[in-house]
Amino acid sequence: MFVATQKSLMEPDPGMAKLVSLMEGSFSSEAQAVADHDFYDIRLEMKRIWEGKGDGGVWLYVEQATATALDKPYRQRVYHLTSSTYRSGDGAEKRVFVSEVWMLPGDPLVYAGAAADPSKLDKLTPAELSRRDGCEVWLVMAADGTFAGSTLGASCGSDRQGAVYASSMVKVNPEGLTTWDRGFDASGKQVWGSVKGAYEFKRRRAE
């Protein structure tokens, strides 16, 4: 379990800059969907927003849609990235990056396409968002500059399809990212999400 120290989140952090550079962009699971029809062709967009808000964190608008309905994303979120330190089991102090999940107000489709046109979020402020407590992903940077992490235990509540909690496992690297989101019932049985493994999102190169 991570235990954050009192080290300031406001200090410059090159690891944060690296993480943001890897997360921001356009991604697709098309290659995975072609190879295995149990996976859908999903497009993932992440765009940095609200720069200079002064809280020391980074905000990302996040949008996921099937390739056949790009104008109707099925998931829209705002991630708030911060960093702190924690002590590992051997007592060593290490850096951890926390990706909080925030929900948009009202009808999220009003903001569809905001990754390409961030001006759609100009009138929206962080104070209008609602946080999904316990659903933050805790990421650690490896020696090769990649990141990996997950939600903690059963902290992320969910009532979707009979679930009582959800879990997310994430890996981020220069080629893209993998995400494995699953829901579990009170007995620990998986009730939604991929049963074959993580979705593999490859970075889409500018044409």
What does each model-identified segment do?
Residues S8-H37, D41, A65-E207:
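Calycin-type beta-barrel ligand-binding domains and close structural analogs
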Residues L44-Y74:
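N-terminal glycine/threonine-rich, aromatic-flanked beta-hairpin/loop signature
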